[in-house]
Amino acid sequence: EAGKDCDCGSPANPCCDAATCKLLPGAQCGEGPCCDQCSFMKKGTICRRARGDDLDDYCNGRSAGCPRNPFHA
């Protein structure tokens, strides 16, 4: 949602200020398949295993989301 950096529904998220929905100082991310302990996972970390003829998807080191490989079946 606009103006929100993270999901502020739970005060238990150690990366997010539940009152403002903003990431805490030093946090890169609050959740996502490529977010680990408030930091982006390193480039090349598998975030989605291949299925069928598809290939594995990897974190890019710059976001918390898991980008689809360009050869997605």
UniProtKB/Swiss-Prot annotation:
GO terms for cellular component: extracellular region. This is Disintegrin trigramin-beta-2. Residues 1-73 form the Disintegrin domain. Belongs to the venom metalloproteinase (M12B) family. P-II subfamily. P-IIa sub-subfamily. Monomer (disintegrin). Expressed by the venom gland. It holds the Pfam family Disintegrin. Keywords: Cell adhesion impairing toxin, Disulfide bond, Hemostasis impairing toxin, Platelet aggregation inhibiting toxin, Secreted, Toxin. Disulfide bonds join C6-C21, C8-C16, C15-C38, C29-C35, C34-C59, C47-C66. It comes from the Eukaryota.
